[in-house]
């Protein structure tokens, strides 16, 4: 093959031709999944190597784009990159220009487990630290992005369930490298919650990928939530999404809307509770009134019993009863019935022949007089062991 039949290029022309072929023959945008190695910032630009274990390529995020990224990778992180090819003809250098970059799910879950283990060891994740939520909150702070559909749903739910509660909406970024901003907001709320009259806070983010919730796996954000002076409720992502922030919160709700349902009593249940308590209060009042009336009746009876005329009548009745008893037991009653009483001369009753002696003077009492007598003989009954005189 003769050299005259082949295309002839200068180095510059060759590199330019290669650049044209790449620009025309390759996709203007593409997605690449890779592992990051040797990331470093030079003059505001992020340079890194993307590899998959078999091949590697240089990538760059220009300073203007780097400021817009929600995620800056560390060495060993898995990433999903949206990019395009950059070819520098002067030195025939090829690189992927990063247009967007997000962590892979593997990276997110690895960070989740790392931070979870760290906070478990520190005692920050501890169910025994969880505090009771207010039953009827007066004022709540809602930390979420503004505007957002999640916030709209939360406001609507709060209005439907318990319009008496006031919501203080605190805008925060909820995605990307925004942990310092969230920590700053939490610090300010912790310092001013008394003045603001807050009862609890809600930190929420609407649905998205698990990768979008990575900021809520940040260790410092989670420490701030765990030590916040008021109860904390999280409503982050979807029901299946679990972040470290959910583990340190006093209550984890599946969604932002569910967070409001958790904190806000429903008007219907509150009305039912009020009705039940009113009924119990009425029953209690009736019972107390009956008890008071019963005590009053008892005291009236006691007062009646202590009146002088009542006391006098009671004593009169007792005296009459005793008189009747005395009359019933009086010897005169037996004398009136024909019996006689035998006494010694000094008036001692004689009940047995052993109480007298022969020739002893006796008194025989009858109903209408006394007979003086002398004991001439003393004769015992056949069954008696008493003495007998001749």
From Swiss-Prot:
Annotated catalysed reactions: Exonucleolytic cleavage in either 5'- to 3'- or 3'- to 5'-direction to yield nucleoside 5'-phosphates
A GO term for molecular function: exodeoxyribonuclease VII activity
InterPro entries recorded: Exonuc_VII_L, Exonuc_VII_lsu_C, OB-fold_nuc-bd_dom
Domain of life: Bacteria
Gene Ontology cellular-component terms listed: cytoplasm; exodeoxyribonuclease VII complex
A family per Pfam: tRNA_anti_2
Main location: cytoplasm
Keyword Hydrolase: yes
EC number: 3.1.11.6
Cellular location(s): Cytoplasm
GO BP of this protein: DNA catabolic process
The entry's keywords: Cytoplasm, Exonuclease, Hydrolase, Nuclease
Function per UniProt: Bidirectionally degrades single-stranded DNA into large acid-insoluble oligonucleotides, which are then degraded further into small acid-soluble oligonucleotides.
Record family assignment: Belongs to the XseA family.
Subunit record text: Heterooligomer composed of large and small subunits.
Name this polypeptide is given: Exodeoxyribonuclease 7 large subunit
Gene assigned in the entry: xseA
């Amino acid at each position: 093959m003769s050299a005259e039949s082949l295309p002839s290029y200068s180095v510059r022309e060759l590199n330019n031709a290669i650049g044209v072929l790449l620009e025309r023959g390759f996709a203007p945008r593409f997605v690449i999944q890779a592992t990051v190695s040797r990331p470093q910032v030079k003059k505001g630009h992020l340079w890194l190597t993307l590899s998959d274990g078999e091949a590697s390529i240089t990538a760059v995020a220009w300073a203007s784009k780097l400021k817009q990224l929600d995620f800056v990778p560390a060495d060993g992180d898995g990433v999903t990159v949206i990019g395009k090819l950059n070819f520098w003809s002067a030195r025939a250098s090829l690189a992927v220009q990063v247009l967007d970059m997000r962590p892979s799910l593997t990276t997110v879950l690895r960070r989740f487990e790392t931070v979870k283990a760290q906070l478990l060891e520190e005692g920050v994740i501890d169910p025994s630290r969880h505090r009771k939520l207010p039953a009827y909150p007066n004022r709540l702070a809602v930390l979420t992005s503004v505007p957002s559909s999640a916030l709209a749903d939360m406001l609507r739910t709060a209005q439907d369930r318990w319009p008496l509660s006031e919501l203080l909406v605190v805008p925060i970024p909820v995605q990307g490298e925004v942990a310092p901003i969230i920590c700053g907001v939490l610090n300010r709320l912790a310092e001013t919650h008394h003045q603001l009259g807050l009862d609890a806070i809600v930190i929420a983010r609407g649905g998205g990928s698990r990768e979008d919730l990575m900021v809520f796996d940040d260790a410092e954000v989670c420490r701030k939530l765990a030590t916040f002076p008021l109860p904390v409720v999280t409503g982050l992502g979807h029901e299946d999404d679990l972040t470290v922030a959910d583990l340190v919160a006093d209550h984890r709700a599946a969604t932002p809307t569910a967070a409001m349902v958790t904190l806000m009593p429903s008007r219907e249940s509150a009305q039912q509770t009020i009705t039940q308590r009113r009924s119990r209060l009425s029953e209690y009042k009736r019972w107390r009134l009956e008890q008071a009336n019963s005590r009053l009746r008892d005291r009236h009876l006691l007062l009646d019993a202590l009146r002088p005329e009542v006391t006098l009548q009671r004593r009169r009745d007792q005296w009459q009863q005793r008189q009747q008893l005395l009359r019933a037991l009086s010897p005169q009653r037996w004398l009136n019935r024909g019996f006689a009483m035998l006494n010694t001369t000094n008036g001692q009753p004689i009940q047995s022949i052993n109480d007298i002696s022969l020739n002893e003077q006796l008194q025989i009492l009858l109903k209408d007089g006394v007979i003086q007598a002398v004991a001439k003989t003393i004769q015992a009954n056949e069954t008696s062991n008493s003495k007998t005189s001749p």
